[in-house]
Every structure is written in C-alpha cells, then in structure tokens.
Amino acid sequence: ASVVRAAGSEVNGFSVGDEVWHSGNRDRPGTYSQFTLVDSRIVSKRPPSLSIAEAASLPLTALTSWEALIDHIRLGTPEERSNKAFLMIGGAGGVGSAAIQLARAITSGPVVATSSRPESAQWCQDMGATGIINHREPLAPQVNDFGITGFDGILSAYTPPASTLAEIIAPFGHLVMIDGTDSFDLMAFKSKSLTVTSESMFSRPQFATPDVAEQGRALASIADLVEKRQIRPTMTRHIEGLTAQHVREATAAVE
C-alpha cells in the first residue's frame, strides 16, 4: 500500500497523490524501499476505510485467493454467487484467512476450513468459516459429518496425499495448490475427472501475460468488498517505521 508520487504519460486512472495498493512483481526490486516502480495495470485505489498498514496486509493473500477461487475454481463472483461447497486446507494462514472471507462473499454453500489447534479454529470461524475439520485426523469422516458429499473446490496450503483428497472432492471438482509437493499421484483423481492447478499470484506480472490488467481489476473488486465489510484485513501486529532494525524484526516474526 502506498501513495502515487509520479505517473507516466501513458498511465490511465491514477494521479499523483492517489492512495493505492498492489502486490508488485517479484522480479522487480523495491520491497523494502521507500519508493518503488510498479506497472499501473496491477494497481488499484486502496480501500479508504483502511490504514496504510492494514491495506498492506491484504493484496498478496487476497489476490492469491481471488485467482484460486474465481479464476481457477470458478466458485462464484461477488455479482453472481453460487451454492458450491469450498474447503480451505490451512485456514488460519494468510491466504486461508483471505480465502475464507472471499468464499463467503461469492458462495452461499458451505465454507469449511482445516485447523488442528483451538485458537486457529476460532480464528477460522472469526473469518467466516461455517465448519472446521481437523487436518490431523482422517478428513472423509469429518466431511461426512457435515453432510457434504464432496467439495466443488479445494484450496490447499498444505496438500495431503491425492488419495485423501480424492475421497472428499466432488466429481469434476477443482484442487488449487499454493504449496510445493515432491510427488502427487494424479491417477487417484482420474475416475472423478478432477482438475489440479498450482497458483502463484506473481505469474501475471512476472510473465507480462496478456491479461495482466486482471490483477488491477481484481484488487479494485477486493477493495469494494472491504468497503462492504465482507473482507477485513488480517494484520495481527504492526511495527511502525521503515528502518533496518524494524525490517529485521518483522522478518524474524514471519520466519
């Protein structure tokens, strides 16, 4: 989250002084800089109700969730809500927190999250999860207890074996993974005609894809959901001031 200090002659929609947000491009330095140069197509006006620190907590996780749920899974949209069932594996993390909120905004179906500790389960419920299952226990019996025959979409931050997921995903369902895995047996998915996708929200800016401007439009939609109080920031700690010591402190806290 930042303020526009200068804009190129071909930039449309932004002026000096605009309060904006973006997640940047990992091939372009500037994360810890006072100023950074960014492609205007991956930027939008930030929600006026948020502080700059609160706004900074959302773009990366919210864009990852948007691309996973809307671009890949096609769970629904803010304008056309569905009734599909969604599971977030790893619900208490940054992406999980954003994905639960976004899912509640685009589907009327069950939004279930996995968690293993009471405090993280409570966090997921605070984010809007309609059900919690323990990922340290067998998943299928817990899913059956909710009366869910299969999830239309699953977003996974900690992907379990394919055979485990094949039991709980609906035919023609969609799995999106944001983690890395050494091996994944796709044959377990064949009988249900399932789709598997990996997700990195940096792909569009990194490779300058023809639809790179979708990222700016997604951020504008996310900002609208924030103003409608359907998505809230997930910041739990604020270290004030851009100094070398604070950068080290914040990095250590994340690690």
Roles of regions detected by a PLM:
Residues 211-255:
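C-terminal hydrophobic helical "lid"/dimerization subdomain
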